[in-house]
Amino acid sequence: MSEHDYWQVESSVYGGVGYAPATLEEYAAIAKALDDEAAGFATIATAWESAALQLQSHRHSAPMCVTLQSGDPSAVVPGHVTAPYAALGNRCYDHATACQRLSDDLRGAADLLIRAHSLYSQAEMTARRMFTELLQAGTQAKPGYAAAGVAAVAAGGFLAGWTIDGKPNPAWMSTFTYPFQEGVLSGAGGIIGGVPIGKSIAHTDEVNKAAGKIANFSGPAKDVVQGNHLDVREVQANADVVRASGSVAESMENLRRLAEERLGKIELNSGLEYGTIAIQRYERSDGTNSWLVTIPGTDGQPDSPFGWAQNVELMSADQERRRKADSARMVAEAMRQAGIGKDEPVALIGHSQGGIVAATLASDWAEEYTIEHVVTAGSPVANHPIPQRTWVTSVEIDDELVAALDGAANPVTDNWLTVQGHVSPAPAATPSTVHSDGSCTPGATPITGLTPYDAAPVAGSTNGRELSHWIKYHQAAYQNATDLGSPAVQRHEAHFQEVINGELKETRYYQGRMTQSTTIAPGERTTEFSTFGG
């Protein structure tokens, strides 16, 4: 690959409320009819190609005949007459190409219909669950073989990626191993969590049980190193980082801006640092408030509540342990300081650890806040006990690894929708050009596909493959799901917009820091939980 590689994401939709079963059956029948017609035109294309080959064979059946060999009627030899074989052959190939193009268009339309309306999603999820359970049982029975097998596939991916990129690139290891990640991780979780083989069929929370056991040791160890005193204070931004939002897509863009600004990936000169979240208050036409909380992911700083160790506590199957996670405590305290009322509607959006925090708040702070909608990007939240009244929109990439750390697929329910994206190479973007006469040709970011709905381009370029855990990949996945016209996505989008409907009145930023001391600066608040013996 080159120094400027471009990517696209093709999405599939699972869960949510689509059309009635009878309507889905009609769509399935239409998709099948389109696929059947595509197969028919493919057969015709093959027949035309065969005819062209037969004509060519007939031309060469008499090697001593100059006129027949040339296939040109103008090459007249007295006493000989020939058909225009060259022209006939070309016409056959033209017909074959046209029929194949029709076949591809029809098959593409069927595929778009299937993806937009999740026509076979139930069968896909059932097969995925069975495969995961088999891998889990195999991992528990023969953990050494499972580890060796995954390591071999990862090594093969590493070598293949080295060949493709021309340099060593570990990102390819996740690309090659993603079909096995959930099953092997759930198997490892079963071993650590002490779940017997076979008894896990009715459950999917093996990883969470294992995380709970690990957190009993990692939590106290983290407190010794980092401290357990959490200071939360409001900070001011010098730039408009998180702007007004009226949709999931706009909120994801704000999430990306805040996440990359605090990590130094972009420079908005806001002055915001790591461990920072945003809380926005929207005022509705009736004077009531609604709220949107934007929560970036792990930053890994030594005194940040969004460190690596907090992920383990957030993933625990134990509610008390989850509530002790510093990042969850930090967001809950910021929401309290912002003045969010118990009965005021709240939407949460988070990436990676931020999404796990959002799911934890929806699960474990349900009595304190009215959390109506949660949007997660690349977050392993399949086993969080989010109440039915809360809508969940999860966006994941199949090979990003992080979203698979829960060892299970997300629930497929009316209120829980998952957009799963698949990354593939895209054509290079074309820059804008200004011509000598002053006219301008705008640049374009093309995709590989027959229609604009086949995939959505990922913003920017890369130098080879990279982990698809960056928010820009989730943005492309959600864009493609939206472009498909999925009724389930449309309903979730409408619900999210309804929750935050109103005029943006304020955007406030809150920063969290972990300390060993209870001494706090003016305007700061501190919260502390004992992680020993509790």
Task: Describe the role of every protein-language-model region.
Residues 347-350, 374-376:
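Extended hydrophobic secondary-structure segments that form protein cores and membrane-embedded regions
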Residues 108-127, 187, 396-404, 431-437:
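A short, terminal or domain-edge coil/loop segment
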Residues 137-348, 361-370:
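Long, composition-driven intrinsically disordered regions
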